[in-house]
Structure formats: C-alpha cells, structure tokens
Curated annotation (Swiss-Prot):
Bifunctional enzyme that catalyzes the enolization of 2,3-diketo-5-methylthiopentyl-1-phosphate (DK-MTP-1-P) into the intermediate 2-hydroxy-3-keto-5-methylthiopentenyl-1-phosphate (HK-MTPenyl-1-P), which is then dephosphorylated to form the acireductone 1,2-dihydroxy-3-keto-5-methylthiopentene (DHK-MTPene). The lineage of its organism: Bacteria, Pseudomonadati, Pseudomonadota, Gammaproteobacteria, Alteromonadales. This is Enolase-phosphatase E1. It comes from Shewanella sp. (strain ANA-3). HAMAP family: Salvage_MtnC. Monomer. The gene is mtnC. Its cofactor is Mg(2+).
Length: 226
C-alpha cells in the first residue's frame, strides 16, 4: 500500500520552537491591546472576544479584561481557539509589514520539495490556526512553500493529544491509516496518532528531548519514503 501522505507538526519539527516562543508569542502579546481596540467590531474578532469570555467564564468582561485574559493565555501557552485565531490575524500584519519572516528548518525546505516531486501529499497539523500556518509557510526563510501543501489542520480538527483528531484528519483526506505518516517531536502526539492507526516518526532535534518507543530522525534528510 505504501505511504501516500505525510502530516507534519510545526513547532519543534518544521520550525524552531524558539521562533514561536521568542518572536511570534511576544509580538502577539504586545500587539493585542491595539489590535482588539481597533478591530473589535470586525465579525471574526468580535466572535473571538465572545468566545474568550465564554471559555474564561467571565461573560461581563470588558475589552481590557479580555485582552488581559488573552495575554495570560499566551504566557500559559493555552491552545484556546479564539487566541490562536487572533494570533494568526496579528501575525498576518507582522509578516506583511516585514517585522519577521517564518523560520523553517532548511532540511524541511529541501524535503518538502523532494516529497512533492514524489507526488506525496503533505499536510501540517498545529495548535496554531490554519491561517497562522499558511503565513508561516508563505513567508518562510525559503520563500513561499504553500503550493507544496495539500492542506492544513488546527484545533478545529481536534486536540493534538486526542486520537479522534487524527481520525478526523484521516476522514478528511480519505486515506487509510497505514498510508499516512505523522512526524512530530512530541511523544504524546505520536501516541495519539498511533492510536488512530497512523504510521509515526519522532523528530529529535534536541539531545535533551524526551523520546518514546518510536522511529526517530534528527533531520528530514533522514526521512526517505520509497
């Protein structure tokens, strides 16, 4: 049957975690107050504000309090969908203004071209919004990589630690589990993907990283799909 699609995690796998933690997250924290104040009547932003109040169980929170909650979630690395949606919108402005480019490991840039030439489908699955993923790959250090991807998945598909999320991906891309390889640096994500029947491979870019009972690679250069 063989592998026909590769699903990749982003932070720690295709992009350096420090880029997320030291560049993107602080940028969103700093930009949130003005962004919300200027865009609070935009339908999408308004929905995110309402969802934040609901999740925080603070239905009467004013805009300043909502901003405070969202900034705290960033510091806690919460995977809340309204936060991730707002971060995607904020980062879009940052990329457009040339504040930063998307860090992508060079070995993945080479590999994504190789996989595409092999007619393999490539997907990304991240706790960051689909919009944020598209921005990362379209404004990458290696240029616009988006045409290499067949699709992207985020928290709307499910929690990355939940087997059902991977079952949902399989249903969406219409492939059997053994035709799909999931690559991530996080053991718990690999465990969930394996429970859904997917093939798995752990990316280990840091010698101090916790590993599990999975095939491991240190670079996409080592990932050969026959």
């Amino acid at each position: 049957m063989g592998i026909r699609a590769i699903v990749v995690d982003t932070a720690g796998t295709t992009t350096d975690l420090t880029f997320i933690q030291d560049v993107l997250f602080p940028y969103s924290v700093k930009a949130l107050p003005d962004f919300l104040a200027q865009n609070q009547h935009n339908v999408l932003v308004e929905n995110c504000i309402c969802d934040t109040r609901d999740i925080a169980l603070e239905p009467d929170a004013n805009l300043a309090r909502v901003t405070e909650i969202l900034q705290q979630w960033v510091h806690e690395d919460r995977k809340a969908t309204p936060l991730k949606t707002l971060q995607g919108l904020i980062w879009k402005q940052g990329y457009a203004h040339g504040e930063f480019t998307g860090h992508i490991f060079p070995d993945f840039i080479e590999a994504v071209n190789r996989f595409s030439a092999q007619k393999l489908r490539i997907y990304s699955f991240s706790s960051g919004s689909v919009e944020a993923q598209k921005l990362l790959f379209s404004h990458s250090d290696g240029g616009d990589l988006t045409e290499m991807f067949s699709g992207h998945f985020d928290t709307r598909t499910g929690n990355k630690l939940d087997k059902q999320a991977y079952a949902n991906i399989l249903n969406t891309i219409s492939l059997s589990p053994k035709q799909v390889l999931f690559v991530s640096d996080v053991v718990e994500e690999l465990k969930a993907a394996e429970a859904a029947g997917m093939m798995t491979c752990q990316m280990v870019r840091d010698s101090k990283q916790r590993t599990g009972d999975y095939r491991t690679i240190n670079s996409f250069d080592e990932l050969v799909i026959d």
